[in-house]
């Protein structure tokens, strides 16, 4: 049985944590703890509690050994109107519910995977990434949501998003993007098996500095695109063309968190997640 995307992410994050020395781990842990809201949940860059950021924070807390107050987290989750969320935030909400349930019940993912959770009808969402329910990124979010809640995963048709160089989030688009290609490859890997010849397109997108650009026209590589690409390549057991170690380290800030690009001076739990994910995928 193939591990879910969430389990693969956690395993990769754990490897990222294991790659840190004691001092580095303490700095990252302190930063993640600083992003916790007193009332439960994690904050965005502006300091406001946010369910999207909370999903990253809870995954980080799990691999860093940060003990969360599950009662406060329950209170926070119960305040959220799940029926009013868009797809991305709803998937984050359901992942948070799953992680908090696991923390309270002390059961593993294998036991949790036996339990099916009801979810909203997928057609009930009015907002999708790229305004397209069928794009690779939207389908990746849906696939992960269905896995997390142990609901049947569908066959996904992505041929209209395929280009000569990879995948795009626009039907019949011309320029492949890193994140659309990584999303498409993760869906194909989960549903059809991880054939490493499929990942060569993604491998070819790497910049010689070690990072990946979001799109060919983007001025510079960023940490999110790099982490998602490296994670996907690791799932396919494909080695990147260039070492990404120095690129990742350049995004680690004195605060203990990671920045989106080398031009950014602030961090949050989302990009700290991507920093550790990238390290774990090396």
Predicted region positions:
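Long, well-ordered core segments of solenoidal/helical folds
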Residues: 21-40, 68-85, 106-129, 148-169, ...
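An alpha-helical repeat/solenoid feature that recognizes helix-turn-helix modules
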Residues: 2-21, 45-67, 83-108, 127-153, ...
């Amino acid at each position: 049985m193939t591990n879910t995307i969430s389990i693969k992410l956690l395993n990769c994050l754990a490897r990222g944590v294991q790659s840190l020395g004691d001092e580095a781990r303490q700095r990252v842990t302190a930063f993640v703890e600083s992003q916790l809201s007193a009332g439960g949940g994690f904050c965005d860059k502006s300091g406001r509690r946010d369910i999207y950021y909370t999903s990253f924070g809870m995954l980080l807390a799990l691999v860093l050994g940060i003990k969360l107050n599950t009662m406060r987290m329950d209170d926070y989750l119960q305040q959220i109107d799940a029926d009013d969320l868009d797809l991305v935030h709803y998937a984050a909400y359901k992942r948070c519910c799953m992680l908090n349930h696991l923390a309270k019940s002390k059961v593993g993912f294998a036991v949790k995977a036996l339990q099916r959770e009801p979810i909203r009808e997928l057609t009930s969402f009015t907002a999708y990434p790229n305004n397209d329910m069928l794009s690779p990124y939207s389908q990746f979010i849906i696939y992960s949501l269905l896995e997390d809640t142990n609901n049947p995963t569908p066959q996904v048709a992505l041929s209209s998003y395929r280009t000569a160089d990879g995948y795009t989030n626009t039907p019949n688009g011309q320029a492949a993007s890193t994140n659309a290609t990584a999303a498409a490859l993760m869906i194909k890997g989960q549903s059809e098996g991880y054939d490493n010849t499929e990942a060569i397109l993604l491998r070819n997108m790497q910049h010689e500095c070690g990072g990946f650009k979001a799109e060919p026209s983007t001025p510079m590589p960023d940490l999110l695109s790099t982490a998602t690409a490296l994670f996907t390549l690791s799932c396919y057991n494909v080695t990147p063309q260039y070492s990404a170690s120095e690129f990742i380290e350049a995004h680690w800030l004195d605060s203990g968190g990671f920045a989106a690009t080398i031009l950014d001076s602030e961090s949050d739990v989302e990009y700290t997640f991507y920093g550790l994910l990238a390290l774990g995928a090396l």
